[in-house]
Regions:
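Active-site machinery of serine-nucleophile hydrolases
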Residues: 1-18, 140
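Alpha/beta-hydrolase active-site loop
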Residues: 12-58
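Stable alpha-helical elements in mature extracytoplasmic
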Residues: 31-38, 72, 171, 175
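Divalent metal-coordination and catalytic microenvironments
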Residues: 35, 61, 136, 179
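Primarily recognizes the serine-hydrolase "nucleophile elbow" in alpha/beta-hydrolase
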Residues: 38-102
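The feature captures the conserved acid-bearing segment of alpha/beta-hydrolase catalytic domains
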Residues: 83-144
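Alpha/beta-hydrolase-fold serine-hydrolase catalytic core, especially in secreted/extracellular enzymes
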Residues: 141-143, 150-216
Length: 216
């Protein structure tokens, strides 16, 4: 996208795709293809691999990713073989949680784990139109990089408040509770009974009587 200031001094928005946007969209598409390929190969070969035989339930598949990988995970909601998607702080490239301009809202359980306390209206609309349970978990202390273990080693990725281990502990608790619920049918106090779509501000627990996340 770009903004052009015309002769009258009025800024006119031009929705043309920027170079960076096009490059990021291509990288997301590549990740989605890779994820789909992994599922293809597991379906075709898992039974013949000794280390995997009997260990995988391919009837229950969840996908999670961070940043562009999070958008790719959201895109995988469109794959009929995927049961739940989790996007960690990947917002939009072409459209909300997508490399495309006009994506469809997720029809599978969807969780967005983010540092953002406020979302663009287009992202909010995705939650309002979601065809299944949709959650937004906000960790205000986090930075984009704090959701990765790189924050333990690179000072520029540290959270704005608290410690790297603190944010990672929240992330682990949310990811586990979400996939426990939607892949293993194991309910717990973090998500059980909450209306969907809903917001969980992880830093202000307890919420509606729910307990705080574990420290580790």
């Amino acid at each position: 996208a770009a903004v052009d200031v015309g002769a009258a001094g009025v800024a006119v928005y031009d929705p043309v795709e920027s170079v960076g946007e096009g490059s990021s969209a291509a990288r997301i598409d590549e990740r989605v293809s890779d994820l789909s390929f992994v599922v293809d190969r597991l379906e075709a070969d898992a039974g013949g691999i000794d280390e995997l035989r009997g260990r995988l339930d391919l009837g229950r598949i969840g996908v999670a990713g961070h940043s562009l990988g999070g958008i790719a995970a959201a895109e995988m909601c469109a794959d009929a073989r995927v049961d739940a998607c989790l996007n960690i702080d990947g917002q939009q490239i072409g459209g909300p949680f997508s490399a495309r301009r006009d994506p469809s809202p997720p029809t599978k359980p969807f969780l967005f784990l983010t540092k953002e306390t406020r979302l663009h209206p287009a992202l909010v609309e995705v939650f309002e139109a979601a065809g299944a349970d949709a959650y937004r978990v906000v960790v205000p202390a986090a930075t984009h990089g704090a959701f990765t273990d790189g924050s333990r080693y690179e000072p520029r990725l540290l959270p704005v408040d608290g410690t790297a281990d603190h944010v990672l502990a929240i992330e682990r608790g949310v990811v586990r509770a979400y996939f426990d619920r939607y892949l293993r049918d194991v309910t717990g106090p973090l998500l059980d009974g909450l209306p969907a779509p809903t917001d969980i501000y992880a830093e202000v627990y307890p919420l509606r009587g729910r307990p705080t996340l574990p420290a580790g």
